[in-house]
C-alpha cells in the first residue's frame, strides 16, 4: 500500500459557485465513490498532539482522513513513515494500523479529522485502543 498524502500547495484552485469562490479540491467529487460506497460519515473532529506526545498505533474499520492545520509530524501507516505538515491531507484506509507523533518534543501538531464508516461495521470505541 502506498501512503496517500496530498498537499494543498499541489492543488490549483477552481472557481466555483457562479465565479465567486475558489475551491481547492483535495479529493475530487466522486473520486472515492467506489471505495466508500455504502459508507457513512462516522465522525468529524479536531485534535492536537502535544510535543513529545503521540497517538498510539491502532486501527479501525473506517476510511479516516487527517488534514494538518498547523505543525509537523511523522505519520505511520502500515509500517510506512512519512513526514506531514500544514496543508497535508492523509488518507488512512480501513483496518490500517496507524499512529502520529510531532517531529519535536517542543511543538505540537494540530489536525482536523473525519472518517467514513464501512458498510456493515459495528460501533467503534475511539477512546480505547
List each language-model region with its residue ranges.
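A short, N-terminal "cap"/entry segment at the start of jelly-roll beta-barrel domains
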Residues: 1-41, 125-129
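Conserved short histidine dyad/triad with adjacent acidic residue
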Residues: 27-33, 44-60, 94
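Short, conserved beta-strand element in jelly-roll/cupin
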Residues: 46-50, 59-75, 116-117
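A short hydrophobic beta-strand segment most commonly corresponding to one strand
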Residues: 47, 91, 106-124
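Short beta-strand His + acidic residue motifs that chelate non-heme Fe in jelly-roll/DSBH
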Residues: 56-57, 75-76, 92, 98-105
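Short acidic-glycine-tyrosine-enriched beta hairpin
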Residues: 79-95
